[in-house]
């Protein structure tokens, strides 16, 4: 995740709510005309479908001056059925664990890329709201020379930062708009619609409901330069889905007082 410096700049720059887009109707059933979807119906204890997901097997360095990048505060992602697996009840489980000498979490990134004019949604339960955990549901672009990231839901176990929904327009975390959100341990759906007028977010979407947060395509001003950035309407620009439960780092904080194992459950991911 690229957006770690944003918190150091504060949460003062909130995007104003703009006109509500016409909501795109989801297919009537899970077998409908989704562009991409996974209901996680695999065998109990198995890895997620490798044709749809790549499981991370390494830790991701995070640059942040808060001090939590020290090794004792930095859990690794592990490609292990202890940390990333399907539970046999139609859920993907990302589990954070505490081993004698380290902490481990899980991250999966989608193999499918989607373009503008799409709606992305996941149903998630956070049994991981404890010190040290750092769960997130987000979209990214890893093309060379590109930038941009969409964080639908991110919670921080460091005890200092509010959970948030954020749009990043560059890779250094200096051009962003963010909205603090309330997060709990119940099941919730987190949806984003991305179109030419902007990016719109809903929690537990119902027909006719306005988005709780919107960022217009006019661009996001960089904190360090008098320029407005917006890669999301570029020709050929795509995003791919990521789900993760990290441990430690600047967002998770010190996990020593946390309760482990801790889990992030994902019922489904759907794009249409």
Regions found by a protein language model. Give the residues of each.
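Viral virion structural and adsorption modules
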Residues: 7-8, 18, 38
